[in-house]
A protein has these predicted regions:
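Conserved catalytic-core motifs of GNAT/GCN5-like acyltransferases
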Residues: 122-123, 139-150
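A conserved beta-strand-loop-helix scaffold within acyl/acetyltransferase catalytic domains
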Residues: 31-54, 58-59, 67-78
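A short beta-loop-alpha structural element at the N-terminal edge
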Residues: 1-19
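Conserved beta-strand-loop-alpha-helix junction that forms the acyl-donor binding cleft
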Residues: 119-130
Length: 151
């Protein structure tokens, strides 16, 4: 049975690294130009200041998924705290089960406890999970475009 736990960055990051690699391989754009190179120091600072939230999905002791969220007051709406999804990943063997909706539901519960007004998720157009978001009561809010311009 999969359970969900809030975890601190410094205690989970080593376990997350193999899943981060799989996640990058599955969804990253511009792989020929941009390699996976997370700023772990920044994540640690954000965790220490309370603006980072990590929800782990575990089957027994095995990490099978994570949802990393940034929590902060929105610069446009200073009276409201937003929870902005950074990354969400569930091992392929646990997809199309109850794990994803249970994870989102647990995250919503935890964010409500923290005084969050709005939760946002983003997804790749070639790896959508719109049906999950709509099932969970989320509204499609905006589109985003991307273009690699460095070289």
């Amino acid at each position: 049975m999969v359970r969900f736990e809030e975890e601190k960055f410094e205690y989970i990051i080593d376990e997350m690294k193999p899943l981060l690699e799989k996640h990058y391989d599955e969804i990253a754009m511009y792989k020929d130009q941009i390699s996976l190179n997370p700023n772990y120091d920044l994540y640690k600072i954000m965790d220490d200041t309370g603006s980072l939230h990590i929800l782990a999905a575990r089957d027994g002791t095995v990490l099978v998924g994570y949802c990393v969220t940034f929590i902060n007051y929105h610069p446009h709406y200073k009276d409201h705290v937003y929870a902005v999804n950074d990354v969400i990943y569930i091992d392929p063997g646990y997809r199309h089960t109850s794990v994803a909706p249970e994870m989102v539901s647990e995250l919503e519960r935890l964010m409500m406890e923290k005084g969050v007004s709005v939760m946002t998720f983003h997804m790749k157009t070639y790896k959508p999970f719109e049906s999950l978001m709509e099932m969970m009561g989320f509204d499609k809010a905006e589109y985003m475009y991307s273009k690699y311009i460095k070289d």
